[in-house]
UniProtKB/Swiss-Prot annotation:
Expressed in reproductive tissues. It holds the Pfam family MutL_C. The gene is MLH3. Heterodimer of MLH1 and MLH3, called MutLbeta, which is involved in correction of a specific subset of IDLs when associated with MutSbeta. One of its GO terms (biological process) is reciprocal meiotic recombination. This is DNA mismatch repair protein MLH3.
Length: 1155
């Protein structure tokens, strides 16, 4: 074994990567790797999950004494010292020198070793990357190393408890880890033993290859299907085993449920190549190596695989011969062979293995399905040639954008017998696709705003529990596609009319349980000139009549289903009831809108010519916001009986709610909701000239209205599809009024609207409002009151930045702009505002509605948190109704109210106070028998008399205890036996003097210190007994053995630097608190002065024994005097007034103080 040396500083800073020991399997793995690097031929692992112990014994080269000194130190290793020998570093497992150091941080590590040819062995004990013991150990006779880990994760109780709660899982992970290592190192003997059950979990014998190990674990049948591989091509060498040519998959009809195991080709390959061809990713499992160039490596493996499989078997695929491969891999293998013949190095198979969107993946249902594991999007893109443009197809997960642009290059049918990459004989392929259509619930979907997809008819024998369906046929002609540009079909080879019977949209009506079984018919081929395409055509059922249901949860969804499914359990709606449930008496579909109306980007397909490519581009669809007969808003489409006058009265009031939210969404310009989608029927036309004055963006050949980019909101006239037009006023003040009326719980003539918050919930916590005057009164006046009365806004003492904002936001269109400007002028002059009066905000008579709404100023500041009576939703006033009660509070001094706060250049509240300001503090009289006021350095502060005296007594008692005056030793009547972990014995011996000084007297019986044997007898035997003879007595309180263990833990955490045990601190805090002055105790001025003088002498004068503050600064007198000096005249403000200093005034103040 090489010499252990510290890594150079340059190498150390270049790595910057640590090893995290997150479970016991990782600890075992690192120790086994060290044994393999030492050249061991036999490695024995002993594991105890409950006792949190691991022992690894090997017969390697061992460690010399000089190397043992550096062993376990961070950045000390024998495997890597310079970047120039990086080729040799790859031969070892871990070369940063951090494994043993990381293990010693979370456990007690013991290393016993004997080097080859050395007379003596050595022992080293470490904890926290620090050496606790290093000496000679002659118990080991043969060369090798024994590493023992005790008390694993002692500093991480959560991880330790989790590990001990599932010992079987931990043992299984360790067995799996060792098995993986044994496959690579078949010439080494491994054994894993559970010491708690004496059960041998895993054992291997040395062999020349891993074939015997595979035969034992995988079975004879599986091993017989493998063939040996050993091929060298230049710098690459691939050896191992892979599935032979006689492997056959199970038939798709016999696979059963999806949760059962399905057989697939297996392989175990070992790739040997120079170090410069790959890079380590350093991920925790150490199972990932990234090649710099994957192309040659993958191509080399492909050639080996194709060479082992018989050539005639592969050719049978072209003739529909034997089913050698899985159906999903058949076409891929054909393409791979064609590409390999042309000299291509990268197969389309790797492209198809990329991450596909969630909508393209099969649903995780327990359904019968075939072995076709190819992406189901191959039905949409039936071509072998894909164009990867930019980042459209990203290998990252959860990154799928509708901006993807796929060009389908159609091959010449005259030169080749295939169409879009499909075999000319497509019977077998269509059958496999038909099976997939029957078993795949999440079919290839094209859902955004309006979606169509390949779906089942109304006789398939399964229930759609999380999807809704449209059984109305959609007829699309060429002109309609050019006009609307809203339907996104990712199919090619469409005729003038495409008949799709159903539509399944992603995240549509959740919880909708359809009791109608659906079935598939044989797919029909839609023939187009020049080629053919596989597009299933499903027959229609003309007699079905659609219905429309809507639910609200993150958007609005439409569900059109057959009359055969009258029972449909809806998901949770927005307010316990649906928006509307009208009936349709025609086959025409309906388009509805939700509360949060968003315009979603959609994919529009341009069908310029069927012989050309189909491009998918991203646009923003424009909608026609119309007005119904009842004044409701909806998306404009062809006339539908659903929106006729007789049927509209049933859901009129509820639907008007959506109109207001529609106005709000249009005004705010929200970003599109990705889960918002619509369902539509045939002949849907969207008017692109809905709001001509809004900002529009030109995209392609059509103009689309980007509603989220609209900045101008004026009176718009929205054309209705009913043949008439209504004036729709989108006014920001009206929208805000509707919003505030809803949030305040008021009602209007459109019907009662429930609050989003449950009535059974407790009231909101009302935050403290610093900028509202104490004398501010919330009141309302009759609607006929004059808004220009001089006492309307007498006490609007809000801050300068917030006053105008609250006036503009709270006073809606009921208040004219002239009155707002007048209010701003009156607020700007501070002399016109009176000091204390009722605060009233008056609204004039409403013009648009009969319902009059009055809002107080506090409600505008926080409408949701306005005080309401719990369970009754009625306002409760927090101030007295009589104004004279408020005027009687003028004597209360509030430094954050009135003109004093508004005009202050500096805050009246001191930011902090230091201990030096207490030196010359002036003590005033006691307040409320609780506090001691002081004036320190121009700052008025109050001192908690209980907290201050508690701090004084605590430091006095602490000084006595540390001096040994208030503590004694109490001997126990009977010796108490202690059972400590192994680490406890070490700590008890290391810190025995400190423990004895405090009064714990222990009798430690030292037995023979023997080393660990192979059977781990030291872990199974009874720990060394320790008897406790005496305990300390602190201020008359006897401590216990539990306090001793707590002190040991503290010493271990602080490396012996702590002085006072935690139990002693608790006793001192309790005694100081019980003996201190309490609230309600009257104090003389002299006693107050003594408390302040004692507080000055303490080390922590601003904290009590429990950490709470003793002193709080109130007012900065210097800043207060500056502000009072700015007040003109002899005006009295909260009892403060500038007066001339006279003898009479001083005499009167003295008389008042005496009385």
């Amino acid at each position: 074994m090489k010499t252990i040396k510290p890594l150079p500083e340059g190498v150390r800073h270049s790595m910057r990567s640590g090893i995290i020991m997150f479970d016991m399997a990782r600890v075992v793995e690192e120790l086994v790797f060290n044994s393999l690097d030492a050249g061991a031929t036999k490695v024995s692992i002993f594991v105890g999950v409950v006792s949190c112990s691991v022992k690894v014994v090997d017969d390697g080269s061992g460690v010399s004494r000089d190397d043992l000194v550096l062993l376990g130190e961070r950045y000390a290793t024998s495997k890597f010292h310079d970047f120039t020998n990086v080729e040799t570093a790859s031969e070892t497992f871990g070369f940063r020198g951090e494994a043993l150091a990381s293990i010693s941080d979370i456990s007690l590590l013991e290393v016993r070793t004997k080097a080859i040819g050395r007379p003596n062995g050595y022992r080293k004990v470490m904890k926290g990357s620090k050496c606790l013991h290093l000496g000679i150990d002659d118990d080991r006779k043969d060369s090798g190393t024994t590493v023992t880990v005790r008390d694993l994760f002692y500093s991480q109780p959560v991880r330790r408890k989790y590990m001990q709660s599932s010992p079987k899982k931990v043992l299984e992970s360790i067995k799996k880890c060792v098995f993986r290592i044994a496959l690579v190192h078949s010439n080494v003997s491994f054994s894993v033993l559970d010491i708690e059950s004496d059960e041998e979990l895993f054992q291997t014998n040395p062999s020349s290859s891993a074939f015997s190990l595979l035969m034992r674990d995988a079975g004879t049948e599986a091993v017989n299907s493998l063939c040996k591989v050993n091929v060298t091509d230049g710098m690459l060498n691939v050896s191992g085993f892979e599935c032979a040519d006689d492997w056959k998959p199970t038939d798709g009809q016999q696979t059963g449920r999806r949760n059962r195991l399905q057989s697939n080709p297996g392989y175990i390959l070992c790739i040997a190549c120079p170090r410069r061809l790959y890079e380590f990713s350093f991920e925790p499992s150490k199972t990932h190596v990234e090649f710099k160039k994957w192309g040659p490596v993958l191509a080399f493996i492909e050639r080996i695989t194709l060479a082992n499989w018989k050539k005639d078997r592969i050719l049978e695929l072209f003739d529909g011969g034997a089913d050698i491969l899985a159906k999903g891999d058949r076409q891929d293998l054909i393409d791979d062979k064609i590409r390999l013949q042309n000299g291509s190095l990268f197969s389309i198979l790797h492209f198809l293995d990329a991450d596909w969107p969630e909508a393209m993946e099969p649903a995780k249902k327990k359904l019968k399905r075939s072995n076709d594991h190819a992406p189901c999007s191959s039905l949409l893109f039936p071509s072998a040639d894909f164009k990867q443009d930019g980042d459209y197809f990203s290998p990252r997960k959860d990154v799928w954008s509708p901006e993807c642009e796929v060009e389908l290059k159609i091959q010449n049918p005259k030169e080749q017998g295939t169409v879009a990459g499909f075999e000319s004989r497509t019977d077998s392929l269509l059958q496999s696709r038909d099976i997939e259509m029957q078993t795949n619930e999440d079919f290839p979907q094209v859902t955004d705003l309006l979606e169509t997809s390949l779906v089942a008819d109304s006789k398939c024998r399964k229930q759609f529990l999380t999807r809704c369906q449209i059984t109305t046929p959609v007829n699309i002609n060429h002109d309609f596609m050019k006009d609307s540009d809203v339907l996104n079909f990712q199919f090619q080879g469409l005729k003038d009319e495409l008949d799709v019977s159903n539509c399944i949209g992603k995240h549509l009506l959740r919880g909708c349980s359809s009791r109608v079984s659906l079935t598939f018919h044989e797919p029909k081929l839609s023939h187009v000139e020049g080629y053919e395409s596989v597009v299933p055509m499903i027959p229609n059922e003309k007699q079905s009549s659609p219905r429309v249901l809507e639910t609200r949860e993150g958007g609005s969804y439409c569900d059109v289903y057959s009359d055969k499914t009258p029972d449909c359990s809806l998901g949770s709606s927005w307010q316990d009831t649906d928006w509307f449930t009208p009936q349709c008496s025609s086959d025409r579909g309906c388009v509805g809108i939700g509360e949060d109306f968003n315009i979603t980007p959609i994919d529009t397909a341009e069908f310029d010519s069927y012989d050309e490519k189909v491009g998918s581009k991203k646009y923003l669809s424009s909608v026609n916001v119309g007005s119904s007969v009842t004044g409701s808003f909806c998306l404009s489409s062809e006339w539908s009986p659903m929106y006729s006058t007789p049927s509209a009265t049933k859901w009129e009031s509820e639907y008007q709610k959506g109109c207001r939210i529609l106005e709000q969404s249009l005004r705010l310009g929200r970003m599109p909701d990705p889960e918002f989608c619509f369902s539509a029927a045939n002949n849907i036309k969207f008017d692109h000239e809905v709001i001509p004055e809004m900002d529009c963006c030109e995209t392609g050949t059509d103009s689309f209205t980007a509603i989220q980019n609209c900045t101008q909101l004026a009176d718009k006239i929205c054309k209705s599809s009913w043949g008439h037009a209504d004036d729709v006023r989108i006014d920001q003040y009206s929208i805000r009024k509707e919003k505030f009326s809803y949030m305040d719980g008021t009602q209007n003539n459109a019907g009662k609207q429930r609050s989003k918050r449950s009535r059974s919930a407790p009231p909101f916590y009302r935050e403290k409002k610093r900028f509202i005057s104490l004398s501010c009164k919330s009141d309302t006046k009759p609607k006929n009151s004059d808004p220009s009365e001089p006492d309307d806004l007498e006490c609007l003492t809000q801050p300068c930045n917030a006053s105008q904002m609250h006036l503009k936001c709270s006073i809606l269109d009921d208040v004219s702009y002239d009155h707002i400007q007048e209010t701003e002028k009156r607020l700007s002059s501070a002399s016109d505002l009176k000091a204390s009066a009722g605060c009233r905000t008056v609204h004039s008579e409403t013009q648009d509605e009969d319902v009059h709404e009055d809002f107080s100023s506090e409600e505008f500041l926080d409408p949701i948190k306005s005080t309401t009576k719990w369970r009754h939703n009625c306002a409760v006033s927090q101030v007295p109704k009589e104004s004279h009660e408020l005027h009687g509070q003028d004597g209360v001094f509030d430094i954050s109210s009135g003109l004093l706060h508004l005009r202050s250049d500096e805050s009246l509240v001191p930011e902090s106070i230091n201990r030096h300001s207490l030196e010359d503090a002036k003590v005033l009289q006691q307040v409320d028998k609780k506090y001691i006021p002081i004036v320190a350095c121009g700052t008025v502060a109050i001192v908690d008399q209980h907290a201050a005296d508690e701090r004084i007594r605590l430091e006095e008692l602490r000084t006595k205890v540390l001096a040994g005056k208030a503590r004694t030793v109490t001997y126990l009547s009977a010796d108490q036996e202690l059972v400590l972990p192994e680490m406890g014995y070490q700590l008890l011996q290391s810190y025995s003097e400190q423990i004895r000084d405090w009064g714990w007297i222990c009798n430690i019986t030292v037995e023979g210190s023997t080393s660990f044997k192979k059977n781990m007898s030291i872990i199974q035997r009874k720990p060394t007994p320790i008897t406790l003879n005496a305990v300390p007595c602190i201020l008359g309180v006897n401590l216990s053995d539990v306090d001793l263990l707590e002190f040991l833990q503290q010493l271990a955490d602080t490396d012996g630097s702590s002085t006072i045990p935690p139990s002693v601190l608790r006793v001192l805090n309790s005694k100081a608190c019980r003996g201190a002055i309490m609230f309600g105790d009257s104090l003389l001025p002299s006693e107050c002065s003594l408390i302040i003088d004692g507080l000055k002498q303490t080390s922590l004068c601003f904290q009590c024994a429990h950490g709470r503050p003793t002193t709080v600064p109130l007012v900065d007198l210097k800043a207060l005097h500056k502000q009072i000096a700015k007040l003109s005249g002899r005006q009295v403000w909260h009892g403060l007034q500038r007066r001339e200093i006279t003898l009479d005034r001083a005499k009167s103040r003295l008389d008042n103080a005496k009385s």
